[in-house]
Amino acid sequence: MKSLCLLAIVAVVSAEVYFKEEFNDASWEKRWVQSKHKDDFGAFKLSAGKFFDVESRDQGIQTSQDAKFYSRAAKFDKDFSNKGKTLVIQYTVKHEQGIDCGGGYVKVMRADADLGDFHGETPYNVMFGPDICGPTRRVHVILNYKGENKLIKKEITCKSDELTHLYTLILNSDNTYEVKIDGESAQTGSLEEDWDLLPAKKIKDPDAKKPEDWDEREYIDDAEDAKPEDWEKPEHIPDPDAKKPEDWDDEMDGEWEPPMIDNPEYKGEWKPKQIKNPAYKGKWIHPEIENPEYTPDDELYSYESWGAIGFDLWQVKSGTIFDNIIITDSVEEAEAHAAETFDKLKTVEKEKKEKADEETRKAEEEARKKAEEEKEAKKDDDEEEKEEEEGHDEL
């Protein structure tokens, strides 16, 4: 046990933190560049939201204007490559407004990104985080490979409540990855298998063709089966119980014809019975060959330059709070950071929100009861007034 603890301590001590932002005070505005790409971007403000533990620790930057694009980014202290290393991108998101449509993701870019002109088309290495619009609730993990943005093929569902949630992306040097939500694994796999970064290893043989005599019919008509002689019956017949109305005039109404009814003896279209096809060979499978266009890449995970992170978002309803950003080469360091920030907030925040929700529910219930009582009292008053008027009229 002591050895394991020592290893954990050594891992954290030797870890490199490339970027950390906790938005503890107003100085964040000096570090985060407001894009000038357009002049009507939405504004971020410093806020811990409605429910928090320690305000200075739990505050982050919050979107503050509805139906706005947001574009703000920050540089790292130095440019670095993650070749041969693990890379961890981690931050918290709280959709306090009960978001209906809007992004909550980050874009992590090269060091040469122009933050003053940061916008939706600015190249990035990785885009990661939750995105919600209507019923769609997904975690984006988009990797840029050779100039093209590639979406993960697996579905990862994000959280959509009004509490703070921790999102973690881990890129490993063996071309594997893991996405965590609130410290729990949400998806793992291979970069090559879960993204279309490389051409397929195998393709259908263009020279292969299904043989002309290949029979894929598992069952065929029984050639010896014959239709019974009494099979053919009309689908509809005249109703034998129908009688011509007594007032029917053939000259005026035309010749009377009984209505048609379904024929109980009708058997439908005859089809011969099916038997096993003795020539059946199964479903023909197109043979595959090695794809000459495929070349393995052991460095799908690796980018030569990392140097900036930004929020490039659209939100219909504002109120999302971002906080506790860390980019490091150590999973242990990211976990330690979460323990000092997210873990200390989540329980208190949930308890306070549940208490507030219960108080709101009780207040609404009391208001409803009061409205019903007032309605009933008014009804009684109206009835008394009506009775008095009727008594006055009798006098």
Curated annotation (Swiss-Prot):
Residues 213-224, 381-395 have a biased composition (Acidic residues). It comes from Caenorhabditis elegans. Cleaved by caspase ced-3 in vitro. It is found in: Endoplasmic reticulum lumen. Residues 202-255, 340-395 are annotated as: Disordered. GO terms for molecular function: calcium ion binding; carbohydrate binding; unfolded protein binding. GO terms for biological process: defecation; determination of adult lifespan; endoplasmic reticulum calcium ion homeostasis; endoplasmic reticulum unfolded protein response; ERAD pathway; hemidesmosome assembly; IRE1-mediated unfolded protein response; multicellular organismal reproductive process. Keywords: Calcium, Chaperone, Disulfide bond, Endoplasmic reticulum, Lectin, Metal-binding, Repeat, Signal, Zinc. Residues 254-292 are annotated as: 3 X approximate repeats. Sequence repeats lie at residues 186-197, 205-216, 222-233, 239-250, 254-264, 268-278, 282-292. Molecular calcium-binding chaperone promoting folding, oligomeric assembly and quality control in the endoplasmic reticulum (ER) via the calreticulin/calnexin cycle. This lectin may interact transiently with almost all of the monoglucosylated glycoproteins that are synthesized in the ER. Probably by controlling the folding of extracellular matrix protein unc-52/Perlecan, may play a role in the formation of fibrous organelles, a hemidesmosome-like structure attaching muscles to the epidermis. Protects dopaminergic neurons against oxidative stress-induced neurodegeneration. Can be divided into a N-terminal globular domain, a proline-rich P-domain forming an elongated arm-like structure and a C-terminal acidic domain. The P-domain binds one molecule of calcium with high affinity, whereas the acidic C-domain binds multiple calcium ions with low affinity. The interaction with glycans occurs through a binding site in the globular lectin domain. Residues 193-301 are annotated as: P-domain. The lineage of its organism: Eukaryota, Metazoa, Ecdysozoa, Nematoda, Chromadorea. Residues 202-212, 225-246, 340-380 have a biased composition (Basic and acidic residues). Residues 302-395 are annotated as: C-domain. Belongs to the calreticulin family. InterPro entries: Calret/calnex, Calret/calnex_CS, Calreticulin, Calreticulin/calnexin_P_dom_sf, ConA-like_dom_sf. Its main location: endoplasmic reticulum. Induction: By ER stress in an xbp-1-dependent manner. By aging. Residues 186-250 are annotated as: 4 X approximate repeats. PANTHER family: CALRETICULIN (PTHR11073:SF2), CALRETICULIN AND CALNEXIN (PTHR11073). A motif (Prevents secretion from ER) lies at residues 392-395. Residues 1-15 form the signal peptide. This is Calreticulin. Disruption phenotype: RNAi-mediated knockdown in a vab-10(e698) mutant background causes 45 percent embryonic lethality. In the surviving animals, causes a 14 percent larval lethality associated with the detachment of muscles from the epidermis. An alpha-D-glucoside binds at residues 105, 107, 124, 131, 312.
